[in-house]
């Protein structure tokens, strides 16, 4: 899932964007957590996802202060994967989605599953799990390799 953000992305919208796998924003994007301003507490995963994405120190700053993070800074702190001029956001998002979609959906699904699963393990246990229990190949591997040789 790719979040494509332009303009304001505050509080609940930020929580939804953080739930996405990838995030692209326009240079006019503004991210902010206003839970504290309104006396609310995050319930959609921000307290997990924001520190995972930007690190605990930066997450505390954003959450405790309620400060605005501009699009370019979002790249610098790891909140967004890409930042583009607002006029190019839709086309760039579509191009990115098409590029991702050309890959094996079996592989993408397994990678996403493994990233979630292995995040809960030690590095050593995660490497062992991937080596011993990871599928290693996707069901469409042979077909995709054969198609690659035809080009």
Give short role names for the model-derived ranges.
Residues 66-72, 87, 91, 95-151:
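C-terminal alpha-helix plus adjacent terminal tail
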Residues 1-105:
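Crotonase-fold acyl-CoA enzyme core
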């Amino acid at each position: 899932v790719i979040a494509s953000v332009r303009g304001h992305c505050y509080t609940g919208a930020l929580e939804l964007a953080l739930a996405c796998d990838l995030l692209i924003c326009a240079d006019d994007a503004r991210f902010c957590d206003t839970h504290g301003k309104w006396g609310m507490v995050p319930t959609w995963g921000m307290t997990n996802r924001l520190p995972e994405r930007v690190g605990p120190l930066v997450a505390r700053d954003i959450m405790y202060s309620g400060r605005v993070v501009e699009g370019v800074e979002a790249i610098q702190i790891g909140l967004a994967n890409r930042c583009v001029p607002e006029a190019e956001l839709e086309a760039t998002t579509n191009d990115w989605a098409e590029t991702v979609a050309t890959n094996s959906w079996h592989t993408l699904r397994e990678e996403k599953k493994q990233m979630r699963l292995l995040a809960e393990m030690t590095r050593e246990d995660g490497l062992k799990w991937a080596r011993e229990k990871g599928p290693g190949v996707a069901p469409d591997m042979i077909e995709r390799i054969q198609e690659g040789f035809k080009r």
